[in-house]
């Protein structure tokens, strides 16, 4: 089927390709619309043209128009409405047009989620759900999710002989926490939901571990990924050797190296000629490569030293590349790689079962609460539209209703959304009615599981002439930007993007062509500002030499100075409304960054230059003093027995105690909770402070009663009113911002109360969970985006926007590789991959599947980051400025020079694939610009033909230090007075203050070591270096055991609380005779009556386990030597820091504190005994397996105990034992080994 396009009117302002996109029909249409090509205008015009054509007999409610955001949908509806009204004004008698205007409010113009919601509300009975459901926010959904997942794991632990589950726990989690398994199930659930049938994907995930019948790695479905990676690295090694040979062949080059280098090259080239059918043959070839010793140069003065070093450097790089290939792919035998996968299959099967069960339980829980979340919408709509793998009657009705389905931003569609769209459009592409608009070069939402390959598949199969399965139209003309911006973008991306690395070729169809008209000016060259962080030695010894500034600070100062310069010089900007140039304003400038980590530094730099600044930053809210104070107060209202929040409130302006007064309160009761000390102080002391404490306790009790009677927002507002805290913070510096933050807390509490969760306790837990996860809410904004300010935002946030001047900052910031180096990897094609953990041998190593998936994820990440950079560069209308810091410009430019002699336009694949930051790409691309060649005076650079205007500035960091900034400041006092501006006053103390402010402590690592630490904390820190300990249990994430409020005491005790109870009993048991069951029951009853133990703790104690200790040989020894036994022995011991932390070289000591459960102290020796409540039975296959892990877990703690006790007592610790109550096992620890 060819194109059936009516001729374009001569008066039309549309380009030929735009006209095609507006008029094409009769088949599916894919419009590949480059940045700034007017795709929204084309889409709107296509819709309006169809609607005003009465002969087409099309109503607006017969169109489905899908956009990416609600804002886009609203704008689309507004534009269509405006177009219809204009048409109606020209033809006021048209009944058809009047009907379209009337139907517009009922038209399906929305996001796909909104369309799915419409389907569900209309056909809820087909999805078997309650029609009165409420749509919840992600925060509420995550809280329900956590509860359901915790309950699921609790159920699994309670099942007897649940060996598959326990094996999974051992394989994928730490030994004391299920946090990793919790996160893994949640991660798998989210990922599976991007597939039309999550259960099928989870089942296929298991199938990838079926390797019983696989005889070679070359048969694995992901072998092409492995092959591609090895080929890429072999070619890189080959290129390194070719560079080395080039240096050896130079005049005065190390010619004696040539024979060795050529031999190396021949060995590597032999690999490329091998058959890929035999893994063993490939392994043998890689391992047999022998890099002979390079010959010694006899007369070194005859050779250019630089050429010699460069030849050696490149040869070493080639050797390293081959070594890495052998390590990554051939470190184990082929049969072992395959057997690893087969051994993991039971765990993967169990994991798949858990994810399915969780999905089922999660949905059931939401159903019981009468709620749905956003993830449910697409799958429930799919359930309604798809029956028995075919379009349902509902779907067929939609196919009849919608004459055309139009989708914007198609490149960001996922597989579920694609399936939904396919079900509501005509089946069969040759009579398709799907109109898709997008730009795969701007597909930057893979982290949201968008699938750009959907776009690419159609782009490659659809034809421009309309023949075949669909019509493809390229819109490459850019109506947004000046030629200078387009030339820069084209110059860079012609060298970066191809199908191999970026998943798309940047060819003639993809490059940007000029479509906009701007007045001529000479200031619009693209600027590359590089700041050399290598220090420049001062010319005089007494010159001010501030400490090293962070990269972000220096770059932020450079950007602030650049903006100030542009404003002061009235940089010309073309005003499209005025149709003429005008001086630049702050609102014309935007700073783009990959992430907002540098926003605080940028804000500080802007303040110094008096530049109004707005950063759309979603962090820092909980760290603000006023919010942290309110959160602490709410924690105290919920449970006053929390020392740190209570001390924070007492010290805050709400109460206003000073350090001395806090000390007086503590002295009233030195031990126990601070709240008890507060009560004692109030009742026993006569003072102004005691009166203040009495008033506070009365007020606290009133708030506690209010928290039970009233809702959360009432409590917060009452606190604001009674304490005048809201008014107080308003009087502080930044008062407007602080008050906005407190209002935001009230608003967020109000939003929380609208969820299915209620109460202060749950709200406090909710906030704690947000803080632990890092899900900060961002400080409240008092400055709007539309004001005359310089804005800073992420590149993702800028997508779809345009700005006169764009500064792309932080180009040397490393890519985020966290997902690639994660323990577990997920992939739409190959499912799940992770390390293999041999529980018996306690060994962990990567699987072949994990290595392959890591390479695939790395390639996808590189392609995505390339597209993110494309989005950043194409936001600029007139001026593009690129900024970065480099550690040493001379060395960095030398690295770029290695590809500068390449004659091909596209940079080598390995250079692009191995990039660590945007500057790696931009530097390697721009160094082939004539201006860079002129700057470096390097004849070897092969410049590329280009119209790109490039201005390169290399600055030193010293130029942005404070004393240098002063030299650039020229303040005209009279002008300031005329403009009623303040006059800067120079202080004689400025330099001294600057010296203090820029002071940097030399022993940075020592700041992470507290002067006093408990043995338990040290055990956790050392366990981080041990892969068999739980790496997630850092102290800040550990649950703290606090006395529970009475209304919570009926709940199940935590493991820590049970452990405390058991230790308390062991301390109290009489050693005068062999204890009996009756003895212990009587003792427990006495401890309960004296409130030493709670009722819940009493019930949790297992008397049989305690008796088991005293019936053991160790227990009998303790009874026999009862007069030598000491229990609950506290100690403090100064230990040299260097003995604990090898990397910290300071002559300091750290105070170690701990408590020994029991010890038998004889004349010359001591025996240590420590009690443990770890779960053993049912969790480990046998005691031998458990004993290995327990020894790993506790050896640091016991060795520290032994070292301290030996030093204090002067006696040798000759034996140390652990007694595990669960199973009544005894484990001896060797105290002679080092840490």
UniProtKB/Swiss-Prot annotation:
Belongs to the helicase family. AddA subfamily. GO terms for molecular function: 3'-5' DNA helicase activity; 3'-5' exonuclease activity; ATP binding; ATP hydrolysis activity; double-stranded DNA binding. It comes from Listeria monocytogenes serotype 4b (strain F2365). ATP binds at residues 33-40. Its cofactor is Mg(2+). Its EC number is 3.1.-.-, 5.6.2.4. GO terms for cellular component: cytosol; DNA helicase complex. Keywords: ATP-binding, DNA damage, DNA repair, DNA-binding, Exonuclease, Helicase, Hydrolase, Isomerase, Nuclease, Nucleotide-binding. The keyword Oxidoreductase does not apply. Gene3D superfamilies: 3.90.320.10, P-loop containing nucleotide triphosphate hydrolases. It comes from the Bacteria. The keyword Cell inner membrane does not apply. Residues 509-800 form the UvrD-like helicase C-terminal domain. One of its GO terms (biological process) is double-strand break repair via homologous recombination. It catalyses: Couples ATP hydrolysis with the unwinding of duplex DNA by translocating in the 3'-5' direction; ATP + H2O = ADP + phosphate + H(+). This is ATP-dependent helicase/nuclease subunit A. Residues 12-482 form the UvrD-like helicase ATP-binding domain. Heterodimer of AddA and AddB/RexB. The heterodimer acts as both an ATP-dependent DNA helicase and an ATP-dependent, dual-direction single-stranded exonuclease. Recognizes the chi site generating a DNA molecule suitable for the initiation of homologous recombination. The AddA nuclease domain is required for chi fragment generation; this subunit has the helicase and 3' -> 5' nuclease activities.
């Amino acid at each position: 089927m060819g194109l059936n396009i009516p001729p374009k009117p001569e008066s039309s302002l549309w380009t030929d390709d735009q006209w095609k996109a507006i008029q094409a029909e009769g088949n599916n249409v894919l419009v590949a619309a480059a940045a700034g090509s007017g795709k929204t205008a084309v889409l709107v015009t296509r819709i309006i043209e169809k609607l005003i054509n009465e002969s087409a007999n099309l109503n607006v409610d017969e169109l489905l128009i899908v956009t990416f955001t609600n804002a886009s949908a609203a704008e689309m509806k507004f534009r269509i409405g405006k177009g219809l009204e204009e048409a109606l004004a020209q033809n006021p008698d048209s009944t058809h047009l009047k009907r379209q205007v009337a139907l517009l409010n009922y038209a399906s113009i929305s996001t796909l989620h909104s369309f799915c919601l419409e389907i569900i509300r209309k056909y809820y009975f087909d999805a078997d759900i309650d029609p009165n459901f409420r749509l919840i926010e992600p925060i509420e959904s995550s809280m329900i999710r956590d509860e359901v997942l915790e309950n699921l794991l609790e159920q699994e632990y309670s099942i007897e002989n649940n060996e598959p589950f326990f094996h999974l726990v051992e394989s994928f989690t730490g030994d004391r926490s299920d946090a990793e398994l919790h996160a893994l199930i949640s991660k798998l659930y989210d990922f599976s939901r991007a597939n039309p049938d999550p259960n099928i994907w989870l089942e296929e995930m298991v199938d990838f571990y079926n390797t019983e019948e696989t005889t070679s790695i070359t048969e694995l479905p992901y072998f092409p990924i492995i092959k591609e990676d090895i080929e890429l690295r072999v070619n890189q090694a080959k290129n390194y050797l070719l560079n080395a040979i080039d240096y050896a062949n130079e005049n005065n080059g190390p010619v004696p190296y040539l024979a060795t280098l050529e031999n190396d090259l021949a060995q590597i080239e032999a690999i490329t000629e091998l058959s890929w059918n035999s893994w063993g043959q490939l392994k043998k070839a890689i391992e047999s490569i022998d890099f002979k010793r390079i010959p010694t140069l006899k007369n070194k003065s005859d050779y250019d030293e630089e050429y010699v070093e460069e030849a050696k450097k490149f040869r070493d790089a080639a050797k390293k590349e081959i070594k890495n290939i052998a390590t990554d792919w051939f470190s184990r035998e082929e049969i072992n790689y395959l057997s690893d996968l087969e051994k993991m299959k039971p765990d993967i099967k169990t994991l798949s079962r858990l994810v399915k069960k969780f999905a089922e339980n999660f949905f059931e829980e939401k159903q019981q609460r009468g709620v749905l979340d956003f993830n449910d919408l697409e799958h429930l709509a799919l359930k309604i539209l798809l029956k028995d793998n075919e379009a349902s009657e509902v779907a067929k009705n939609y196919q009849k209703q919608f004459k055309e389905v139009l989708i914007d931003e198609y490149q960001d569609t996922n597989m579920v959304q694609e399936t939904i769209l396919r079900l509501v459009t005509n089946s069969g592409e040759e009579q398709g009615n799907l109109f898709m608009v997008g730009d795969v070069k701007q597909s930057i939402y893979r982290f949201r599981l968008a699938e750009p390959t959907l776009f690419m598949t159609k782009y490659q199969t659809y034809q421009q002439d309309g023949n075949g399965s669909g019509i493809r139209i390229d819109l490459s003309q850019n109506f947004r930007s000046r030629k200078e911006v387009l030339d820069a973008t084209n110059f860079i991306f012609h060298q970066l993007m191809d199908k191999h690395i970026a998943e798309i070729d940047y060819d003639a169809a993809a490059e940007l062509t000029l479509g906009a008209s701007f007045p001529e000016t000479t200031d619009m060259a693209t600027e590359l500002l590089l700041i050399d962080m290598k220090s420049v030695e001062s010319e005089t010894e007494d010159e001010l030499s501030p400490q090293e500034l962070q990269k972000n600070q220096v770059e932020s100062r450079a950007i602030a100075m650049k903006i100030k310069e542009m404003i002061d010089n009235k940089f010309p900007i073309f005003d499209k409304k005025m149709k003429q140039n005008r001086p630049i304003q702050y609102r014309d400038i935007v700073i783009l960054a990959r992430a907002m980590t540098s926003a605080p530094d940028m804000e500080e730099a802007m303040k110094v230059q008096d530049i109004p600044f707005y950063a759309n930053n979603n962090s820092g809210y909980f760290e603000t003093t006023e919010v942290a104070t309110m959160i602490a107060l709410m924690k105290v209202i919920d449970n006053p027995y929390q020392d740190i929040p209570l001390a924070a409130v007492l010290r805050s302006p709400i109460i206003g105690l000073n350090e001395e007064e806090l000390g007086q309160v503590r002295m009233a009761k030195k031990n126990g909770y601070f709240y008890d000390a507060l009560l004692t102080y109030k009742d026993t002391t006569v003072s102004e402070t005691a009166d203040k404490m009495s008033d506070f306790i009365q007020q606290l009790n009133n708030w506690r009663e209010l928290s039970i009677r009233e809702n959360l927002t009432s409590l917060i507002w009452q606190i604001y009113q009674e304490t005048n805290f809201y008014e107080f913070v308003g009087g502080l510096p930044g008062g407007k911002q602080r008050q906005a933050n407190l209002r935001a807390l009230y608003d967020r509490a109000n939003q929380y109360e609208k969820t299915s969760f209620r109460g202060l306790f749950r709200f406090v837990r909710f906030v704690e969970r947000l803080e632990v996860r890092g899900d900060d809410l961002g400080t409240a904004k008092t400055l709007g985006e539309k004001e005359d300010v310089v804005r800073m935002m992420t590149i993702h946030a800028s997508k779809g926007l345009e700005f006169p001047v764009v500064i792309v900052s932080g180009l040397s910031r490393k890519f985020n590789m966290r997902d690639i180096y994660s323990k577990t990897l997920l992939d739409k094609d190959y499912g799940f991959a992770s390390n293999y953990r041999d529980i018996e041998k306690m060994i962990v190593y990567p699987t072949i599947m994990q290595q392959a998936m890591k390479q695939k994820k790395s390639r996808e990440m590189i392609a995505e980051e390339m597209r993110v950079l494309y989005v950043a560069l194409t936001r600029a209308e007139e001026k593009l400025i690129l900024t970065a810091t480099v550690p040493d410009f001379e060395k960095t430019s030398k690295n770029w020079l290695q590809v500068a002699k390449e004659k091909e336009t596209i940079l080598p694949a390995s250079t692009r694939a191995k990039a660590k930051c945007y500057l790696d790409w931009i530097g390697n691309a721009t160094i082939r610009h004539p201006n860079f060649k002129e700057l470096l005076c390097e004849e070897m650079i092969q410049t590329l033909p280009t119209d790109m205007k490039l201005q390169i500035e290399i600055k030193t960091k010293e130029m942005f230090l404070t004393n240098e900034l002063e030299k650039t400041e020229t303040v005209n006092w009279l002008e300031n007075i005329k403009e009623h501006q303040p006059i800067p006053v120079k202080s004689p103390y400025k330099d001294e203050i600057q010296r203090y402010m820029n002071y940097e402590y030399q022993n940075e690592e020592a700041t992470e070591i507290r002067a006093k630490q408990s043995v338990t904390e040290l055990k956790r820190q050392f366990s981080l270096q041990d892969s068999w300990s739980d790496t997630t249990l850092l102290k800040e994430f550990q649950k703290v055991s606090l006395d529970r409020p009475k209304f919570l005491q009926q709940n199940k005790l935590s493991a820590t609380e049970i452990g405390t109870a058991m230790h308390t009993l062991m301390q109290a048991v009489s050693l005068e005779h062999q204890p009996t069951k009756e003895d212990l029951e009587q003792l427990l009853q006495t401890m309960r009556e004296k409130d030493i133990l709670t009722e819940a703790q009493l019930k949790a104690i297992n008397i049989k386990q305690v008796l088991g200790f005293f019936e053991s040989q160790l227990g009998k020894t303790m009874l026999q030597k009862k007069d030598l036994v000491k229990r609950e022995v506290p100690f403090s011991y100064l230990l040299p820091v260097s003995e604990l932390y090898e990397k910290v070289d300071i002559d300091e000591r750290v105070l170690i504190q701990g408590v020994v459960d029991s010890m038998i102290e004889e004349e010359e020796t001591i025996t240590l005994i420590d009690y443990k409540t770890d779960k053993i039975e049912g969790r480990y296959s046998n005691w031998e397996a458990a004993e290995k892990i327990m020894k790993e877990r506790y050896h640091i703690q016991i060795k520290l105990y032994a070292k301290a006790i030996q030093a204090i007592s002067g006696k040798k610790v000759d034996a140390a034992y652990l007694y595990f109550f669960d199973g009544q096992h005894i484990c001896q620890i060797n105290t002679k080994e080092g840490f």
